[in-house]
């Protein structure tokens, strides 16, 4: 393929108007870095460079595409964000396989912007409720004895962390992470981790003393969820999970309103 022919081609002039609605307007030209990125991505997807294989050096890519170093570096940085290459200091870029974490991290910026909009937190809380509702139903029907033992261990850590808010938050996240691991789907794990990260980051600041009662209630609700899973009762597990997440949502909304009144 003559890569440079594609880079140098110019669009033909279009007519002043097409039909009644389309009128001539200038087409945005792609940056050189974007064209380099697209071509390298196609090469990777065609397996011209295999997973784990190093790409040519920056100097070789500059010569091949007839572009400057900034264009090559921007293209490689974009491929890294997509999870298609790994870049370590002093080494050539190496082809990698995109992971579920990579896919979710690409959405992270947009998600955080969305959370700042009116109703954004409520929409993400609803997404979490729908998602974890399916997880606990699956767990009640399919969790192995070993997985239930891991949930029990997570409960024990919950119990030991009740008087330390920072530890309890970590143990709370760990409890829900164990739930998300039960189906064995890495995409579920990536979604779950991202959802909790986004929601926790959006929570208001709260004094430690105000969190103690909330921590104990969450712990008791975790017990109810695990009991229902042990009983292999998906409906009961679902109800316990919904009670828990609705309670968590109401508590943090109340904390947020209280903070606003104090300003």
Curated annotation (Swiss-Prot):
Query: What Pfam families does the database record attribute to this sequence?
Result: FCD, GntR
| Example GO molecular function | DNA-binding transcription factor activity
Q: Which SUPFAM superfamilies match?
A: GntR ligand-binding domain-like, Winged helix' DNA-binding domain
Q: Which UniProt keywords apply?
A: DNA-binding, Repressor, Transcription, Transcription regulation
Gene Ontology BP terms: negative regulation of DNA-templated transcription
The record's listing under PANTHER family reads:
HTH-TYPE TRANSCRIPTIONAL REPRESSOR NANR, TRANSCRIPTIONAL REGULATOR, GNTR FAMILY
Family of the protein in this entry? Belongs to the NanR family.
Q: What is this protein called?
A: HTH-type transcriptional repressor NanR
Query: Which organism is the protein's source?
Result: Salmonella bongori (strain ATCC 43975 / DSM 13772 / NCTC 12419)
């Amino acid at each position: 393929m003559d890569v440079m022919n594609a880079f140098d081609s110019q669009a033909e002039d279009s007519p002043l108007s097409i039909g009644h609605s389309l009128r001539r307007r200038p087409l945005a030209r792609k940056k050189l870095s974007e064209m380099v990125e697209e071509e390298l991505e196609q090469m990777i997807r065609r397996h011209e460079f295999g997973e784990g294989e190093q790409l040519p050096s920056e100097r070789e890519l500059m010569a091949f595409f007839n572009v400057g170093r900034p264009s090559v570096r921007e293209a490689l940085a974009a491929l890294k964000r997509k999870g298609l290459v790994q870049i370590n200091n002093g080494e050539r870029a190496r082809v990698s396989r995109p992971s579920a974490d990579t896919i979710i991290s690409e959405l992270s910026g947009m998600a955080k912007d969305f959370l700042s909009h009116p109703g954004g937190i409520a929409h993400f809380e609803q997404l979490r409720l729908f998602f974890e509702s399916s997880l606990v139903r699956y767990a009640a029907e399919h969790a192995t004895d070993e997985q239930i033992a891991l949930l029990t261990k997570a409960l024990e850590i919950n119990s030991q962390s009740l008087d330390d808010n920072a530890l309890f938050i970590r143990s709370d996240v760990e409890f829900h992470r164990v739930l998300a691991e039960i189906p064995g789907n890495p995409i579920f794990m990536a979604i779950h981790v991202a959802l909790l990260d986004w929601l926790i980051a959006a929570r208001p600041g709260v004094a430690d003393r105000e969190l103690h009662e909330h921590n104990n209630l969450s712990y008791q609700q975790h017990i109810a969820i695990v009991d229902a899973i042990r009983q292999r009762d998906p409906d009961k597990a679902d109800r316990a999970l919904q009670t828990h997440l609705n309670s968590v949502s109401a508590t943090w909304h109340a904390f947020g309103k209280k903070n606003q009144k104090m300003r």
